[in-house]
Amino acid sequence: MMERTFSIIDFGACSTTDELQTRYIQAAIDECFLQGGGEVQIPEGTFLTGGIRLRSNVCLHLMENAHLKGIRDPEAYGVLEDDVIEPIPNNDRTVKLYHTPTADENFQTYEWFNRAGSRWNHGLIRAAYAKNVSVIGECGSALDGSDCYDALGEEFYRGPHLMNFFYCENITLRGYTCVDSANWAHAFFYSKNLIIEKVKIYAGHDGVHATRCDNITIRQCAFYTGDDCVAGFDNQNVIVQDCLMNTACSAMRLGATNALIEKCRFWGPGEYVFRGSLSLEEKRGGGKPQKIPSHRYNMLSVFTYYADFSTAIREQPGNIIIRHCNIENVDRLLHYNYSGNEIWQKNRPLQSVMFEDVYAMGISMPLTAYGDEKVPLYLTMRNVDIQFAPEDENMDFIHTCYYSMINLENVRIQGLSNGALVRSWGGQGRLIYKNLICDIPKENYFLTSDKSFVCQTI
């Protein structure tokens, strides 16, 4: 039986007009869904649109040089809340708007974040309670978020995501390019079985951000983002393979149980600006700002732990492995700061992380490995070659507290000589080193600090 195909042209869509094409695109998706599923084709051309809803068993196929361009009107993206074919439950709706999170908040105060039918969750392409959905792009296809400004959005300037999925299963995303997403390029919540492959992401904010999702595979993707490349927490079974990661924030801001990041290249500084450093006028105007000193491009870290209180965490985070990777010109290799001054790292602590077969150069800050008294950190570095470009010649290699084990095996450290190999603020576990090559004197391999722990938050 041949798969049903539907062209948006047959439903009235046109690429040679400034008229909004949302209703025509949505009509094609709805008809495909009502007939049992199939493929909706977006032909070559640029189609101006607001939010559209993807439904179960529907593949949105962007043909060669097909572009979906989001309108710069934040009121045009409420498709999920207005839908009559598959109305979302009342308890998944809210009028609560984004507010700046504080350290003492809990799950209940994140209603604007956790409910599919919120303004913050608006997106160019949205799906909720859907199964077997896909977005496939051919050569030259693109999704353009137009840096849509929203004064009611996150940080009072971010607009809709490019894609937003809630309670979905079996999602496949492949082959297209994302540009200028007004918030995250891909936002996933409470979903499972996600495959993102051969996708390119330029500028905007987070590339892929998943919250409470299971079985995520990201492979052969290219991230050139203003914010984190891959982010999220309370995720289980995450694989990131063969990806390029360039950002003005963290390559991985992740909390997960069982995560493998391998065969990736990380490098800074970012090609695109961290948009939070722009002026209000620049945020409103969109577009590509000039490079000036007040704009931030430096890449903050390779791996930053993430665990806030926007959702409960089901399983103990840990078994995170970063291996067979090359790293250049990044401020930090590891940023795990459970000391209490970082609101994004105050939910459940991290149990273990490993770097294996990693080459890094141009690192400018110590590794931070500050664990929890009840769940101390197990840090492994095996077959790691790391070259520092320190701002201070007395810089340490690792800053730590509450660890069960720091295991350094076949590790070569270059560029550090006067500081400590490991400087501890208490809660000592075991330090093991084998075949360690460095210029740090042995009497400085382990030092304790009598000063207050200070760590810049990111």
Predicted feature residues:
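Extracellular/periplasmic carbohydrate-active domains that bind, remodel
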Residues: 1-458
